[in-house]
């Protein structure tokens, strides 16, 4: 009793094998083998056009097996396809022969011996037939003379790249099929009802295949009209990578460059370091992106963004230079005011006396001056007659003054003397006073002295973010709207 399950299983297997043999088609007696049929066909076959009166109708379809990445530098992409051709050749019909099957799988060595439309991809850069391990070609001959050929191909085909919208761009790549040897009077090419099929979802590192389409055209060559079949693949770039690797770092770099507005105007080394570091960082990021793109003469969306960001960082450097300039201008104004105050404290007053407007000098607000010059025996002034201004704003001559030739005078007159009104005894003081006035430059001309560095920084810390926000609104609205329009089309 313990062997009942094993016996039941054996009986079921026997019944199933018997039913399978009953369903198997039996060849009639006297049926020819495939080799004998092919030898008979090829013995009388001539490799000429199948139909001399009309053009041969060739139907084509492709099955997309896989795709490689789209290369922007070389402007091409790689694709693996199963390329199928179907046509009718009455000379290969074996319906009149006693065949066991209605179709025969031919050896690939017989393919060069039969007529073919010689269809090729005229725009491919490279096309190879897979060999793993043998050549991946299948030829099936039907009893009515229909020939079905399938090649497993690896194709490298060009793409029409337009990078104006990069990295929000949409690219198209085209495969073009033609008969290399026969024009449309001999061979007509047609797409099958389901011309292109995807064997699996296509996922590329940088792109999504969003659409594909087929069409047929007729082109005029010097030797006639030729049928041309085209399949167009549309790819949309995944820009998430560039958002993370390009846009976010530039945002951070721009914000870092604005930190200099919060520093003191006197912190020139720190502000310069921040600005130059931000500028170098943006330049490095821009170059890192451009090295993976072809050299095109038009402006890309990424170019607009990077150049705009570089302009904003450069603007912070210009603002720094402006702040430094007006800071120096303010210092010059303050220094000029101090020097003018010292000049007012050392003016020459009427009647040969000098009165200071400050209250810190000795001698009751008077200075000592040589009122009557003395001369030596040669009639020349003594070397002690050279006037000098003391550190307290007093004017005296070199050398120890003599009581005989000194006179102290004080007046209440506030009318200053001009050089023409100076007494003869003070004519020798004219160069000294002129030198004093020439060493005190006038304040800077123009209205830059009215600005204050702190006010410029406060204005910049508001104006730069507002301008950058406006730039962002215009930039993203322009390019994203064009991207949506392309998707809609």
From Swiss-Prot:
Stretch list, region Disordered: 365-398
Compartments reported by the entry: Membrane; Cell membrane
CDD domains according to UniProt: LGIC_ECD_GABAAR, LGIC_TM_anion
Origin superkingdom: Eukaryota
Tissue occurrence: Expressed in a subset of muscles, and head and tail neurons, including RME and GABAergic ventral nerve cord neurons. Expressed in AIY, RME, RID, RIF, ASI, DD1-6, and PVN neurons.
Annotated Gene Ontology cellular component terms: neuronal cell body; plasma membrane
Gene Ontology biological process terms from the UniProt entry: behavioral response to starvation; chloride transmembrane transport; chloride transport; locomotory exploration behavior; positive regulation of fatty acid beta-oxidation by serotonin receptor signaling pathway; regulation of locomotion; sensory perception of chemical stimulus; serotonin receptor signaling pathway
Signal peptide: 1-20
GO MF term list: ligand-gated monoatomic anion channel activity; serotonin binding; serotonin receptor activity; serotonin-gated chloride channel activity
Pfam families the UniProt entry points to: Neur_chan_LBD (PF02931), Neur_chan_memb (PF02932)
Cytoplasmic side: 325-458
Residues engaged in binding serotonin: 180, 226
Record: glycosylation sites: 44, 103, 144
Transmembrane portions of the chain: 241-261, 274-294, 304-324, 459-479
Main localization category: membrane
Biased composition (Polar residues): 372-391
InterPro entries according to UniProt: GABAA/Glycine_rcpt (IPR006028), Neur_chan_lig-bd (IPR006202), Neur_chan_lig-bd_sf (IPR036734), Neur_channel (IPR006201), Neuro-gated_channel_TM_sf (IPR036719), Neuro_actylchol_rec (IPR038050), Neurotrans-gated_channel_TM (IPR006029), Neurotransmitter_ion_chnl_CS (IPR018000)
Residues in the Extracellular compartment per record: 21-240
Keyword terms of this UniProt record: Cell membrane, Coiled coil, Glycoprotein, Ion channel, Ion transport, Membrane, Plasmid, Signal, Transmembrane, Transmembrane helix, Transport
Membrane topology per record: Multi-pass membrane protein
Function comment: Functions as a 5-hydroxytryptamine (serotonin) receptor. This receptor is a ligand-gated anion-specific ion channel, selective for chloride ions. Relays a long-range endocrine signal from the body cavity neurons to modulate distal adipose triglyceride lipase atgl-1 function, via the nuclear receptor nhr-76. Together with the G-protein coupled serotonin receptor ser-1 involved in male mating behavior. May mediate an inhibitory effect of serotonin on egg laying.
Family: Belongs to the ligand-gated ion channel (TC 1.A.9) family.
Entry protein name: Serotonin-gated chloride channel mod-1
Source organism (scientific name): Caenorhabditis elegans
Recorded name of the encoding gene: mod-1
């Amino acid at each position: 009793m313990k062997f009942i399950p094993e016996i039941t299983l054996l009986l079921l297997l026997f019944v199933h094998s018997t039913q399978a043999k009953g369903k198997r088609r039996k060849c009639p007696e006297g049926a020819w083998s495939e080799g004998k049929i092919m030898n008979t066909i090829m013995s009388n076959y001539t490799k000429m056009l199948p139909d001399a009166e009309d053009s041969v109708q060739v139907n084509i379809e492709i099955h997309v097996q896989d795709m490689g990445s789209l290369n922007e530098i070389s402007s091409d992409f790689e694709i693996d396809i199963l390329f199928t051709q179907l046509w009718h050749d009455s000379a290969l019909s074996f319906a009149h022969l006693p065949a066991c099957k209605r179709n025969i799988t031919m050896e690939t060595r017989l393919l060069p011996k039969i007529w073919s439309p010689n269809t090729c991809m005229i725009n491919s850069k490279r096309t190879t037939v897979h060999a793993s391990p043998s050549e991946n070609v299948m030829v099936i001959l039907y009893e009515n003379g229909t020939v079905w050929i399938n090649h497993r191909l690896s194709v490298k085909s060009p793409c029409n790249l337009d990078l104006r919208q990069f990295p929000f761009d949409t690219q198209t790549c085209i495969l073009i099929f033609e008969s290399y040897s026969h024009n449309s009077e001999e061979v007509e090419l047609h797409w099958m009802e389901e011309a292109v099929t995807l064997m699996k979802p296509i996922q590329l590192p940088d792109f999504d295949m969003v659409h594909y389409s087929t069409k047929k055209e007729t082109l005029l060559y010097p030797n006639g009209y030729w049928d041309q079949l085209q399949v167009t693949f549309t790819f949309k770039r995944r820009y998430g990578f560039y958002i993370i690797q390009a846009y976010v770092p530039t945002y951070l770099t721009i914000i870092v460059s604005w930190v200099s507005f919060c520093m003191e105007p006197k912190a020139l080394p720190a502000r310069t370091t921040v600005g130059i570091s931000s500028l170098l960082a943006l330049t490095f990021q821009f170059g890192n992106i451009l090295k993976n793109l072809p050299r095109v003469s038009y402006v890309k969306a990424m170019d607009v963004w990077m150049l705009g960001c570089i302009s904003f960082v450069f603007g912070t450097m210009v603002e720094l230079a402006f702040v430094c300039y007006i800071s120096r201008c303010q210092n010059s104004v303050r220094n000029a005011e101090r020097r003018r105050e010292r000049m007012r404290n050392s003016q020459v007053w009427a009647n040969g006396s000098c009165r200071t407007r400050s209250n810190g000098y000795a001698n009751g607000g008077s200075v000592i001056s040589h009122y009557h010059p003395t001369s030596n025996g040669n009639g020349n002034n003594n070397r002690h007659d050279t006037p000098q201004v003391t550190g307290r704003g007093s004017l005296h001559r070199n050398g120890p003054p003599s009581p005989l030739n000194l006179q102290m005078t004080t007046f209440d007159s506030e009318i200053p003397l001009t050089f023409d009104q100076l007494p003869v005894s003070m004519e020798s003081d004219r160069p000294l006073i002129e030198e004093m006035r020439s060493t005190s430059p006038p304040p800077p001309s123009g209205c830059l002295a009215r600005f204050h560095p702190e006010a410029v920084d406060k204005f910049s810390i508001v104006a730069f973010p507002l301008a950058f926000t406006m730039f962002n609104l215009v930039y993203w609205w322009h390019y994203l709207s064009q991207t949506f329009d392309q998707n809609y089309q």
